[in-house]
C-alpha cells in the first residue's frame, strides 16, 4: 500500500507562533537584516534625527546617533540570540525570567498595547501626510477617514500573512527606500543644503545625554521584541549579523538624513521634501513604503503577544493579528492615537526594562545556555519586581540615558534577587542550580 505524501501548504501564511521554529524554517541572516532595515527607516526616525539636531551641531548630532544605536543594537543582539537559541518569540522566551503567567498576563499585555498604539499612531501619520500631499500638490481633496482605512488595512493585512510576506515586502522596499533617501539628499545638496548645514547653529544648546537618549528611544522597544523575528535565525552569528547590518546603517542613516533635511530644507519629512521639489508621487512612495515596512511589525508583534496572553494555538495568529491591526486602525480613524500618546510614554518606559530582566536571567544567571533553560510556571516575582524597578528609573530617572539606566537597574535587581532568595518554588535560578548540583553528585 502506497504511503500518501503530505502536501505542504501552498499558502504564504505563517504557521509557527508560540512553538519552536523548526530548523527547516530558519532563514539566512541577510533576509532578517532586510526586515530590520525596513523597521528603522520610517518617518518618526527622520523626526527623531531633527529633534537631536535641534540641540547640537551636525557633527555632535551624528556622533550621538551612532552611540545611541550602538547601545540599542548591543542589547538587541542579546535578546535576539536568546530567541534564536530557543526558536521562540520574545514573550515565550522570557517565560522563565517572568514566569509563564507573568510573561502572559503582564509583559505580553504591555507589548500588545504598546504596538497596537504605535500602529495607530503611525497609520494616522501616514494617512494625514498622504491627504496633505494629495491636496497640497495634486489638488485632490482626499478624505482622511478613507486614507486611514486604506493604509491601515494594507499594513495589517501584510502582517496577517506573517514573516514570509513581511520578508518579501522589505526585500522589495528597502532598496527602493535607500535609493530615494540618497536621491533626496543629493537633490537637497544641489539646492545649496551643504552651506546651510556648515553654518548651522542650534537654536538651543542641549547636552550629549539628550541626544543619546533620543537616539536610544527611537528603537528601544523594537530591540526588546526582536526575538519575534530572530527566532528564525540559523545561529548566533547570523542573529548578530542580521541585527548589526540591518539596524546600524539604516537606522543611523535615517536619523542623520532627518537631521540634515530639517536644517537644510526646514522639514525632516522626506516625503514633503520630494513634493516641494515637484515630485509628489515620489514623496508618496517614500511615505507609504517607510510606514508600511515599519507598521507591519507593530501589528505582527502585537498579534504574537496576544496569542501568548490567551495561550492560543499557532493557527489563531492570523485572526488575532487582523483584530489587533483593525484596533490600531480604529485608533487612527477615531483620532485617539494622539490622546493615547501620554499613555504610550508610560508603556515606552516599561518595554525596554523587559530586556534587563531577560538579559540577567538568560545570560548572567542562566550562563547563556539554552540547555539549562525551561519555562517557570506561575509568576517569577523576582523578575516582575526587577522589571518595575527598571521601568521606574527609565520613566523618572535623570542620570545619563534613563532608558539604558532602567535596563541596568533591572539587571542588577534581578541578579541580587536570584542570588539572595533560596527557594526553588519562587526562584527558577535557584531551582536550576539545584538540579545542576544534584546531577553532578549523581555522576
Language-model segments: residues:
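Juxtamembrane transmembrane-helix boundary signature
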Residues: 66-98, 107-117, 121, 421-427
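Membrane-interface loop-to-helix entry segments
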Residues: 127, 146, 150-188, 200-203, ...
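Hydrophobic alpha-helical segments and their helix-loop junctions in multi-pass secondary transporters
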Residues: 159, 175-201, 216-219, 258-263, ...
Amino acid at each position: 500500500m502506497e504511503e500518501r505524501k503530505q502536501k505542504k501548504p501552498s499558502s504564504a501564511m505563517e504557521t509557527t507562533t508560540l512553538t519552536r521554529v523548526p530548523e527547516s524554517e530558519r532563514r539566512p541572516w541577510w533576509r532578517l537584516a532586510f526586515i530590520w532595515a525596513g523597521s528603522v527607516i520610517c518617518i518618526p526616525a527622520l523626526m527623531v534625527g531633527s529633534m537631536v539636531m535641534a540641540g547640537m551641531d551636525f557633527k555632535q548630532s551624528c556622533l550621538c546617533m551612532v552611540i545611541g544605536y550602538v547601545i540599542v543594537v548591543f542589547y538587541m543582539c542579546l535578546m535576539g540570540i536568546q530567541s534564536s537559541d530557543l526558536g521562540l518569540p520574545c514573550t515565550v522566551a522570557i517565560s522563565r525570567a517572568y514566569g509563564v503567567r507573568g510573561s502572559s498576563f503582564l509583559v505580553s499585555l504591555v507589548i500588545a498595547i504598546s504596538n497596537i498604539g504605535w500602529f495607530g499612531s503611525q497609520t494616522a501619520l501616514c494617512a494625514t501626510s498622504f491627504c496633505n500631499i494629495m491636496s497640497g500638490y495634486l489638488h485632490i481633496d482626499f478624505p482622511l477617514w478613507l486614507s486611514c482605512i486604506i493604509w491601515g488595512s494594507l499594513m495589517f493585512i501584510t502582517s496577517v500573512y506573517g514573516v514570509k510576506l513581511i520578508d518579501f515586502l522589505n526585500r522589495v522596499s528597502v532598496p527602493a527606500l535607500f535609493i530615494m533617501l540618497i536621491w533626496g539628499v543629493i537633490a537637497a545638496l544641489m539646492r545649496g543644503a551643504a552651506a546651510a548645514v556648515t553654518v548651522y547653529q542650534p537654536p538651543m544648546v542641549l547636552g550629549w545625554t539628550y541626544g543619546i537618549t533620543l537616539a536610544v528611544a527611537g528603537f528601544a522597544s523594537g530591540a526588546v521584541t526582536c526575538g519575534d523575528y530572530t527566532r528564525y535565525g540559523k545561529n548566533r552569528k547570523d542573529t548578530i549579523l542580521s541585527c548589526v547590518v540591518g539596524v546600524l546603517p539604516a537606522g543611523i542613516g535615517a536619523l542623520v538624513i532627518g537631521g540634515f533635511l530639517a536644517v537644510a530644507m526646514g522639514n525632516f519629512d522626506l516625503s514633503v521634501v520630494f513634493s516641494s521639489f515637484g515630485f509628489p508621487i515620489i514623496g508618496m512612495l517614500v511615505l507609504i513604503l517607510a510606514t508600511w515596512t515599519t507598521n507591519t511589525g507593530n501589528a505582527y508583534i502585537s498579534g504574537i503577544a496576544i496569542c501568548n496572553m490567551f495561550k492560543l494555538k499557532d493557527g489563531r495568529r492570523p485572526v488575532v493579528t487582523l483584530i489587533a491591526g483593525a484596533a490600531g486602525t480604529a485608533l487612527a480613524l477615531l483620532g485617539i492615537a494622539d490622546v493615547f500618546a501620554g499613555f504610550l510614554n508610560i508603556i515606552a518606559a516599561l518595554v525596554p526594562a523587559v530586556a534587563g530582566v531577560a538579559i540577567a536571567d538568560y545570560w548572567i544567571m542562566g550562563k547563556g545556555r539554552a540547555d539549562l533553560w525551561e519555562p517557570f510556571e506561575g509568576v517569577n516575582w523576582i523578575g516582575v519586581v526587577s522589571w518595575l524597578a527598571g521601568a521606574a528609573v527609565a520613566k523618572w530617572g535623570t542620570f545619563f540615558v534613563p532608558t539604558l539606566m532602567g535596563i541596568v537597574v533591572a539587571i542588577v535587581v534581578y541578579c541580587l534577587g536570584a542570588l539572595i532568595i533560596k527557594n526553588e518554588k519562587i526562584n527558577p535560578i535557584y531551582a536550576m542550580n539545584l538540579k545542576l548540583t544534584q546531577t553532578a553528585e549523581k555522576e
